[in-house]
Amino acid sequence: MVKHQQTPAYIAAILYSFIIGLSFLFVKIALQTAEPFDILAHRFTIAFAAATVPILFGWVKLSIRVKDVIDILPLALLYPALFFSFQAFGLVYSSSSEAGIIQAAIPIFTMVFAAYVLKERPTWTQKGFTVLSVAGVMFIFVMKGVDVESASLKGSLLILLSALSSAMYNTAARKMTQRFKLTELTYIMSAIGFVVFNAIALVRHGAAGTVGTYFLPFREPGFVLAIVYLGVLSSLVTSFLSNYTLSRIEAFKMSAFNHVSTIVTMIAGFVILNESLAWYHLAGAVCIMIGVVGSNINLEKKTKRPGMPAKK
């Protein structure tokens, strides 16, 4: 029965990985027209608008009290607010390769947090497979080249804080999905992202005296296409898929699927953007896939029941 209930969760996790993996292509398109924080602001504006439409038409019913918002607020601040903010500021001082290596450790951080907070007890083989998937991602970024001399302590710290925010979100969301409806969690997360990133972007534009250019990127059809994908699919839909998956399987298992998006990004870059695909990409991808599958399968005879039961 449990395995049958978990099947949709794994489908959701795979779909989540594909959407996130492809999102990097649309981020590249959006960056040709707008600044990173403007992109974040616009994508969560689209996400919040898309989440509000079915509520206005009565297709989705929400029964959110002020107390519920206060309870969910810390979760929404961890992701998307803190995760994307630390990441965006961190990338100003760090290379994408350095950031990729640090954020590859998110499943390990999640495993540690989940062990203490949720009492999740992965087996030693699951721990080993998780480390293997992390090593696969790190191997790819290391082989691509990391400029150690230009590495910034400030940038590394900000990226680390971004990774910790994601790990804490995975852990907290696992518990919150047992208390609140997935639509409620997703809606409030979108609302917080909308408020936080628009505030940051407008303050930055206000300081630079460029508020009048805030919506200029929407003149470009390519930007509109990219921001709709990032807002509706990569923000709203993935938030729902992530919350759904975390309501069914352990946090450390879901976290491992983040690495699958790395493979999707590599394949999409190779097929669509004609980017090179070297042997170390393939070697790393094999390690990632073996690690993700292995971390989600218990190969030991005795299975310790996870601390957080699956939501029925």
Swiss-Prot record:
Bilayer-spanning residue ranges: 11-31, 46-66, 72-92, 98-118, 128-148, 155-171, 183-203, 221-241, 254-274, 277-297
Membrane topology: Multi-pass membrane protein
Keyword Phosphoprotein: no
Positions of disulphide bridges: none
UniProt keyword annotation of Metal-binding present: no
Domain (EamA): residue spans on this chain: 18-142, 164-297
UniProt keywords, alphabetically: Cell membrane, Membrane, Repeat, Transmembrane, Transmembrane helix, Transport
Database matches in SUPFAM superfamilies: Multidrug resistance efflux transporter EmrE
Compartmental location: Cell membrane
Family in the record: Belongs to the EamA transporter family.
Protein's name in the database: Uncharacterized transporter YcxC
Gene transcribed to yield this protein: ycxC
